Amino acid sequence: MKRTYQPSKLVRKRRHGFRARMATKGGRGVVAARRNRGRKRLSA
């Protein structure tokens, strides 16, 4: 059986990276919420 998590740096950055977050209104909200909470890492 194939495992569900097949790591790929490229796919990770494209799907969850900072630029992917900033591309949508919802994503900008996620980054803003993480900034307000004081997260060290805002995105993948």
Swiss-Prot record:
Q: Which GO terms describe its molecular function?
A: structural constituent of ribosome
> PROSITE patterns given for it?
RIBOSOMAL_L34 (PS00784)
Cross-referenced HAMAP family: Ribosomal_bL34 (MF_00391)
What protein name is recorded for this chain? Large ribosomal subunit protein bL34
Gene coding for it = rpmH
Q: Which Pfam families does the annotation name?
A: Ribosomal_L34
- Xref: Gene3D superfamilies: 1.10.287.3980
One GO cellular-component annotation of the UniProt record comes to:
ribonucleoprotein complex
Going by the UniProt record, its keywords in alphabetical order are: Ribonucleoprotein, Ribosomal protein
Q: Which family does it belong to?
A: Belongs to the bacterial ribosomal protein bL34 family.
The UniProt annotation puts the region (Disordered) at: 24-44
Q: Basic residues bias: where?
A: 34-44
Family matches, as InterPro entries: Ribosomal_bL34 (IPR000271), Ribosomal_bL34_CS (IPR020939)
Q: Which organism is it from?
A: Mesorhizobium japonicum (strain LMG 29417 / CECT 9101 / MAFF 303099) (Mesorhizobium loti (strain MAFF 303099))
Gene Ontology biological process terms in this record? translation
